[in-house]
């Protein structure tokens, strides 16, 4: 296996050689709250990365990846962030569904879907959240029923799943071809029991996708309605009724080594905010200076924690990481608004536009991917061994 520093140098040089021409215009585009930016152009960039063998780095070689270590992947994400390269468009496929299929999927599912994730020809979205469930992921009301003739031919015959229900806050659904959906497949089941993890094609009459207008004026999220939508009987990952275990497995992949690359981007945002404070005169305010110093200290603490735990698997470490970066980024957004002063009250304001968008989207940082309250409950109950929260 290539040495980490040699691989880091390879990535740095490749990015310098390739993030040029039309691709240079994509620098800094995409990411949370900005997924709509130059989407098709970023897809082309993502395919360019794939052709160079710079996607799916941690996947096993037999599944098309490079089988690289956590340290190699950290090096990639750090160099990628330092180059200000555009956010990838196939996050859900490369970092969530792909590893899930490798861990829980059948050989047939792996053969069918992994190559198209690798070459970025099929995009995926995540069908977890529901409108009446809040942060309670187990409160699933979307249903799926297996119908058809099981005896017609083969193990599942002519059977297929019929899906009804609604998912919400579904990022990238209006660009994706497929959605991995958690649905209730056992009538009368409650909570974690009776759930299944289904792979559902979105281009069919039984699926309606409605973009949600955000505070920023963009539409990155969607509502997805399933009205007798169908998917093949064999497109359940794991066993029917075992969907909770598979879904939790997917979530363990969600908060991975990309966090260190994310922190490089945060460091750039912090540096840019310091420069803005100097230009506007806000840096003359001792309270602003103190908050900027505290923010920088928090960023270093996050990085130290991520480096110390990247090779360690223990309960709660991902939850602590999520709490750290979500709170840090929300506070940075608040500092940015104060640095702008009265100019921060209007959205279309040239130089300040990016900071207002950062502030608006950072309000969601402590909610999506598991709210702060959920993270604290998990840490308290599963790590510290405290009594479970009393339900009202």
From Swiss-Prot:
Disruption phenotype: Deletion mutant grows normally on glycerol but shows impaired growth on cholesterol. It accumulates 5OH-HIP in the culture supernatant.
Entry GO CC: plasma membrane
Keyword Nucleotide-binding: no
GO biological process: cholesterol catabolic process
The entry's keywords: Cholesterol metabolism, FAD, Flavoprotein, Lipid metabolism, Oxidoreductase, Steroid metabolism, Sterol metabolism
Record Pfam families: Acyl-CoA_dh_1 (PF00441), Acyl-CoA_dh_M (PF02770), Acyl-CoA_dh_N (PF02771)
MF terms in GO: flavin adenine dinucleotide binding; oxidoreductase activity, acting on the CH-CH group of donors
UniProt pathway: Steroid metabolism; cholesterol degradation
Positions annotated to bind FAD: 126-129, 171, 371-373
Keyword Cell inner membrane listed: no
Residue stretches in coiled coil: none
Group of enzyme by EC: oxidoreductase
Active site: 254
Transmembrane segments: none
Subunit structure of this chain's protein: Heterotetramer composed of 2 IpdE1 subunits and 2 IpdE2 subunits.
Family: Belongs to the acyl-CoA dehydrogenase family.
Protein name: Acyl-CoA dehydrogenase IpdE1
The organism's taxonomic lineage, starting at the top: Bacteria, Bacillati, Actinomycetota, Actinomycetes, Mycobacteriales
């Amino acid at each position: 296996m290539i040495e980490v520093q040699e691989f880091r140098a390879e990535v740095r040089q490749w990015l310098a050689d390739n993030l040029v021409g039309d691709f240079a215009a994509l620098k800094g585009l995409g990411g949370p709250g900005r997924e709509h930016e130059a989407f098709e152009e970023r897809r082309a960039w993502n395919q360019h990365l794939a052709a160079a063998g710079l996607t799916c780095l941690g996947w096993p070689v037999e599944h098309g990846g490079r089988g690289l270590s956590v340290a190699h992947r950290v090096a990639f994400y750090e160099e990628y962030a330092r180059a200000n390269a555009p956010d990838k468009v196939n996050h859900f496929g490369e970092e969530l569904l792909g590893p899930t299929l490798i861990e829980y999927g059948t050989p047939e599912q792996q053969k069918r879907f992994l190559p198209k994730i690798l070459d970025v020809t099929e995009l995926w979205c995540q069908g977890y959240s529901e409108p009446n469930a809040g942060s309670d992921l187990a409160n699933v009301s979307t249903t799926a029923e297996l119908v058809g003739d099981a005896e017609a031919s083969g193990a599942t015959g002519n059977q297929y799943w019929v899906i009804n229900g609604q998912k919400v806050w579904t990022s990238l659904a209006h660009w994706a071809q497929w959605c991995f959906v958690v649905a209730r497949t056992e009538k009368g089941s409650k909570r974690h029991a009776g759930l299944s993890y289904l792979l559902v094609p979105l281009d069919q009459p039984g699926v309606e996708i409605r973009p949600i207008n955000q505070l920023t004026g963009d539409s990155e999220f969607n509502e997805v309605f399933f009205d007798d939508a169908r998917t093949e009987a064999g497109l359940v990952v794991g066993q029917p009724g075992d969907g909770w275990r598979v879904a939790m497995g997917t979530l363990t992949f969600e908060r991975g080594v990309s966090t260190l690359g994310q922190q490089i981007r945060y460091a750039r945002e912090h540096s840019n905010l310091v420069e803005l404070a100097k230009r506007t005169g806000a840096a003359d305010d001792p309270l602003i200076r103190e908050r900027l110093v505290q923010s920088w200290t928090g960023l270093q603490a996050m990085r130290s924690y991520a480096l110390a735990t990247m090779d360690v698997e223990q309960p709660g470490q991902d939850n602590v990481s999520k709490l750290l970066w979500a709170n840090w980024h929300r506070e940075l957004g608040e500092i940015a608004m104060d640095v702008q002063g009265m100019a921060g009250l209007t959205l279309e304001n040239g130089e300040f536009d990016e900071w207002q968008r950062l502030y608006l989207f950072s309000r969601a940082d402590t909610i999506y991917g598991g709210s702060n309250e959920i993270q604290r409950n998990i840490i308290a109950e599963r790590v510290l061994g405290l009594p479970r929260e009393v339900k009202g």
